[in-house]
C-alpha cells in the first residue's frame, strides 16, 4: 500500500498525478498509522547492521527499528512521503538516508547490506519480482529480508473478490494490487522463507487484510 511513484508511470494525466503525488501519501500515512505499530514491531524485530528498506513511505517503521540497526538506506520515490517522514527520521536513533527512488533498480554494489525490510510495498511496486531480485543482489550471503505484505488470500472465495476489486484498487491506491502471491514471489526470487505467518488482519475486510509476515534468507 506504499505509494511508490505510480504517478511517474506512462499514461497518467495531471489529475491522477496530483492525487498520487499530493493526496495519496497523506492518506497512506494515516491509514497505515498507529494501529499497525504492533505488526511493525514484529517485522522489525531481529533487524541488525546496515539495512535497506524499500518502500520507506512516511517512515512509520523508524520508531520500531531495534538498537542493533546501525544505518538505514531508505528507498522512497514519493517526495511528499519523504517530507512526512522528516520528524521520524530526525528522531531516529540511527542514521536514515534517502538513498534511492526505485526498488527495482537499487543503486548499491552487490552484497552490501546485512538486512532488508519491506512493508506493504510488493503490492504496489510495478515489478515486485524485479525488486526482490535487486534486494537479493544487494544483501550479503545469509542476510535476511523482513517482510510484511498484503496479497493473495489463501481462500478462493476471498480471491474472487480480490480479482474483482483489483482494477478499482489500482486506480484508487496508486497501483496497489490485492492479488500478489507473496510467498511465491519470494521463493521464485531465490529466497528461502524461514518464518511465515499468514493471517487475516482483524478489523479490515479479508480481501485487503490477507497478510504475510515473516523473514526470508538470501542465498
Each predicted region: which residue ranges?
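A short acidic, Gly/Pro-enriched loop at the edge of an enzyme's catalytic core
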Residues: 101-116
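Class I SAM-dependent methyltransferase SAM/SAH-binding core
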Residues: 52-105
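A short glycine-rich, Lys/Arg-flanked "PGG" loop and its adjoining helix->strand segment in the class I
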Residues: 129-141
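Conserved beta-strand signature within the Rossmann-like core of class I S-adenosyl-L-methionine
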Residues: 142-150
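Conserved alpha-helix/loop element of class I SAM-dependent methyltransferases that forms part
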Residues: 27-50, 60-64
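A short SAM/SAH-binding and catalytic strip from SAM-dependent methyltransferases
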Residues: 114-127
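Short alpha-helix
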Residues: 174-190
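Core SAM-dependent methyltransferase catalytic element
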Residues: 191-219
Amino acid at each position: 500500500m506504499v505509494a511508490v511513484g505510480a504517478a511517474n508511470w506512462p499514461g497518467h494525466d495531471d489529475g491522477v498525478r496530483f492525487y498520487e503525488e499530493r493526496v495519496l501519501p497523506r492518506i497512506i500515512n494515516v491509514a497505515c498509522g498507529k494501529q499497525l505499530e504492533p505488526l511493525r514491531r514484529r517485522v522489525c524485530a531481529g533487524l541488525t547492521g546496515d539495512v535497506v528498506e524499500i518502500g520507506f513511505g512516511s517512515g512509520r517503521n523508524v520508531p520500531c527499528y531495534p538498537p542493533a540497526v546501525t544505518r538505514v538506506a531508505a528507498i522512497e520515490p514519493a517526495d511528499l512521503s519523504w517530507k512526512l517522514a522528516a520528524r521520524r527520521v530526525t528522531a531516529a536513533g540511527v542514521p536514515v538516508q534517502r538513498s534511492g527512488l526505485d526498488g527495482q533498480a537499487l543503486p548499491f554494489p552487490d552484497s552490501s547490506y546485512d538486512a532488508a525490510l519491506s512493508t506493504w510495498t510488493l503490492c504496489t511496486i510495478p515489478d515486485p519480482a524485479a525488486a526482490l531480485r535487486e534486494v537479493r543482489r544487494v544483501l550479503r550471503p545469509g542476510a535476511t529480508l523482513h517482510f510484511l505484505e498484503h496479497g493473495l488470500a489463501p481462500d478462493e472465495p476471498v480471491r474472487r473478490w480480490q480479482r474483482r476489486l483489483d482494477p478499482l484498487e489500482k486506480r484508487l491506491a496508486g497501483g496497489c494490487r490485492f492479488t500478489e502471491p507473496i510467498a511465491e514471489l519470494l521463493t521464485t526470487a531465490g529466497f528461502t522463507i524461514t518464518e511465515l505467518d499468514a493471517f487475516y488482519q482483524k478489523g479490515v475486510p479479508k480481501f485487503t487484510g490477507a497478510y504475510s509476515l515473516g523473514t526470508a534468507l538470501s542465498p
